[in-house]
């Protein structure tokens, strides 16, 4: 017997309403749990090639190694909407967790952990002498003359020390970050929106101030534009050449692209938890990956040493880490362990623990993008796992 057509497409995931999620709802709960793992089904993406053939996946290592000291770890991971969690100590995967329906070879959206990857590519080009961090941005991208980026140096962009008229309120439809999203194809376009990310960046203004921290996602896309200009490559190709192809990654990463093909460097990368851990491993190994050196030892040391504490103005971060700072697209806790992290909204973390030579990856789908409540729970898990590793 033939099934009668309903005139609707099948639901994208169990329980989803017909047509959901849309461009305007995929970042919201409950849709984000599906979308963060299946972004290529919603948005145009490009592959960040690993170059060599993929290697067979290793079996999953459970949480047993941490169970004695952290018996409630799995419960805490579930309570914080964790999709993937991994602890890499040296070259050994010590513990892993994947929620039901999420596999070790599934990619997950990194959100602003993507910024730390971009900062690493810029570091590689600085090491090569192709970017001078002291030079003004417009030396590389003259199209930004007349914008807020006309005057500040590349290093000030890296460290997010530019005063800019940019509201990073992810739920405010009138905010610049939502206009940024729409220009990049992450939300439904509106009349009058810039045609693409390049054009959006040229519209940004500010008071000309520098030297004080202001978190702004546009800064990372400016860095990606500089990368394109000095290499002659699309950002997605540069990310592959200077980072991903050297990691011995299990899978290609992906990055969302706008209608011009510009990769959304500030938040659009997706990869597996295991491959993200390889980025952290490279950093703790002094910038060296299986495929060769990515960045210099000096670059890594600059990141691990942290940035200007005097410049840091983010009260949410300093309430948890009073000595915290931001440098080269990484968050630096300034705590006694020297923890450094790439952080993304909705619960994405690439956490480095130099004391135990360990990397912790936590990929999540919080219902809220960015609140002290969720960050407090997340930081508590990461710190407790780091301390537990002292005795493992």
Swiss-Prot record:
Pathway: Xenobiotic degradation; nylon-6 oligomer degradation. GO terms for biological process: nylon catabolic process. Involved in nylon oligomer degradation. The keyword Hydrolase applies. It comes from Paenarthrobacter ureafaciens. Keywords: Hydrolase, Nylon degradation, Plasmid. It holds the Pfam family Beta-lactamase. It catalyses: [N-(6-aminohexanoyl)](n) + H2O = [N-(6-aminohexanoyl)](n-1) + 6-aminohexanoate; N-(6-aminohexanoyl)-6-aminohexanoate + H2O = 2 6-aminohexanoate. Gene3D superfamilies: 6.10.250.420, DD-peptidase/beta-lactamase superfamily. The EII enzyme is 100 times more active toward the substrate than the EII' enzyme. Its EC number is 3.5.1.46. The keyword Hydrolase applies. The active site is at 112. One of its GO terms (molecular function) is 6-aminohexanoate-dimer hydrolase activity. This is 6-aminohexanoate-dimer hydrolase. It comes from the Bacteria. Residues 1-22 are annotated as: Disordered. The gene is nylB.
């Amino acid at each position: 017997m033939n099934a009668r057509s309903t005139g609707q497409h099948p639901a994208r995931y169990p329980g989803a309403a017909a047509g959901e999620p849309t461009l305007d709802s995929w970042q919201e709960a409950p849709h984000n749990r599906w979308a963060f793992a299946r972004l290529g089904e919603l948005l145009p993406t490009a592959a960040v090639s690993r170059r060599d053939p993929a290697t067979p996946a290793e079996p999953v290592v459970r949480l047993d190694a941490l169970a004695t000291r952290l018996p409630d770890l799995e419960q805490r991971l579930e309570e914080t909407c964790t999709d993937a969690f991994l602890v890499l100590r040296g070259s050994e995967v010590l513990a892993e967790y994947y929620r039901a329906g999420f596999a070790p070879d599934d990619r997950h959206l990194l959100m602003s952990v993507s910024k730390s990857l971009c900062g690493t590519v810029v570091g590689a080009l600085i090491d090569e002498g192709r970017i001078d961090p002291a030079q003004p941005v417009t030396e590389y991208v003259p199209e930004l003359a007349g914008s807020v980026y006309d005057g500040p140096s590349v290093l000030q962009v890296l460290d997010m020390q530019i005063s800019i008229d940019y509201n990073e309120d992810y739920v405010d439809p009138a905010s610049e970050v939502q206009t940024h999203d729409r220009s990049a194809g992450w939300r439904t376009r509106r009349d009058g929106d810039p045609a693409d990310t390049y054009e959006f960046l040229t519209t940004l203004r500010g008071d000309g101030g520098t030297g004080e921290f202001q978190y702004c996602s546009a800064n990372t896309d400016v860095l990606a534009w500089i990368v394109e200009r000095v290499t002659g490559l699309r950002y997605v190709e540069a990310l592959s050449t200077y980072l991903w192809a050297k990691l011995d990654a299990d899978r290609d990463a992906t990055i969302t692209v706008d209608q011009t093909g510009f990769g959304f460097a500030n938040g659009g990368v997706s990869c597996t938890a295991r491959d993200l851990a390889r980025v952290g491993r490279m950093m703790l190994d002094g910038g060296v990956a299986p495929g060769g050196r990515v960045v210099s030892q000096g670059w890594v040391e600059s990141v691990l040493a942290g940035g200007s504490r005097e410049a840091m103005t983010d009260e949410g971060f300093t309430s948890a880490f009073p000595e915290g700072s931001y440098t080269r697209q990484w968050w630096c806790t300034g705590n006694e362990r020297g923890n450094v992290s790439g952080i993304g909204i909705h619960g994405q973390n690439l956490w480095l623990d130099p004391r135990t030579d360990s990397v912790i990856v936590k990929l999540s789908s919080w219902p809220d993008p960015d609140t002290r409540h969720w960050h407090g729970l997340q930081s508590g898990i990461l710190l407790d796992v780091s301390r537990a590793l002292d005795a493992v």
